Amino acid sequence: GDYYRRQLELMLQPGTPVYVPMNPPKKNGGQRLVELGGLALSFMMAPEIFWNPLSQEVKDSLAVRMLSYGEGGTYECNWRFFNVNIMSFFLSQGYHTDKAYLEELLQILLAAYRGDGWYHDNPLFDYYSMWAFQMYGSLWSEKFGKKILS
């Protein structure tokens, strides 16, 4: 875990190869949004390795940086899960997030359900329709949904 935690610190430092800049307000974060959404899942699934050992200063800096992507724009498809995962993780840790935007994205994702386990990935059915919605939706529901929406 030490290697990964060091990389998290480096992503906050300009001039390092892994530096991640702030995302301009409401701008689509592109591929960085995807990567940070995955990072939020890592924090969620293994906090004892990736999140808990970090200093409060690093946690706070990661929250600001990652929320600039999570609260930013997204593509109108399964990518909404990346925003949702980022915002939900930091909300669960006591950070302020745009709850209205989070709820809006969740409602849109729920509306994509077409029955019998199928979701459309706006506007098509594609390979994400058969796994991304089920996996990300189930993880979100188990880790956050029961807590955040209660």
Please give the residue ranges for each predicted region.
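Aromatic-lined, polymer-binding surfaces characteristic
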Residues: 2-150
